[in-house]
Amino acid sequence: MQRALWIGGPPGVGKSTVADRLARRHGLRLYSADTRTWIHRDRALAAGIEAAERWEALPPTERGNGSPDELLAMSLHVERGPMVVDDVRALPPTPLVVAEGSTMPASLVPVDRALWLLPTQELQRRRLEKRGLPLPARALYELLSATIAAEAAEARVPVLSVDGSLGIEETVDQVEHHFAWFLAAESGTATLKERRELLREANLDIVAQLRGFFARPWADGSAEQVERSFACECGDPACTARIESTVGVAAAGPVFGPGHER
């Protein structure tokens, strides 16, 4: 727990991009809770959690139906928090971990090592409208955002309000400033080889997530030809490139942006 920085907040607020860029700048290990979705669901099923069993049994076309409370319960928001903590504790002791996700458990993380990114109501409204989500999904997002904000307030976790006025680099700078004391001890300690290994690890986490989805008995098709965005593995601290690649190609790796192979 003392070897991690924790970034929480609702979906779509920019956590993943901020954490990715912070990790790449400083040569840190990235942990994204989304990449453990199917591992966590399997743990919940093994533990006999009724909401997990109910979701798994529903036809995929019906999983978006139901009340916001029912959908939130089946998202396993509460149950996944301790799983996230267990995951991070199991990671190697070095380097420092940047852990991000909507399931970050505000009540279980050290507040001096945490920062929650919370959108303003106006920004959330604009983003939900832009996505064109059906009403049940939109209601779930609104409830999840309110739940995460309430959890942060109760745990007294520091909050960065996101209103859309700052670009991503400016937001990363603010998060970097918040964690400056911890980052100062890490910057410059990772070799190029270590940076590349950490980027490979993060990309393979995405590969595992997608393969985990297509391994479900109700999923059709194969993950190998699915395209996703992967981090360039050049290891340059200034590199922010992300490469569209199929899962199969990214798994074979390494993934490089044009001209970044050296």
Where are these regions (language model features)?
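Hydrophobic anchor at the beta1->P-loop junction of P-loop NTPases
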Residues: 7
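ATP-dependent small-molecule kinase phosphotransfer cores
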Residues: 39-96, 210, 214, 224
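A glycine- and Lys/Arg-enriched "phosphate-lid" helix/loop adjacent to the NTP-binding pocket
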Residues: 109-157
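Conserved lysine of the Walker
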Residues: 15
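The conserved Walker
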Residues: 11
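NTP-dependent small-molecule kinase module
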Residues: 147-201
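Short beta-strand-centered segment that lines the nucleotide-binding/catalytic pocket of NTP-utilizing
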Residues: 26-44
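Hydrophobic positions on the alpha1 helix immediately C-terminal to the Walker A/P-loop
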Residues: 18
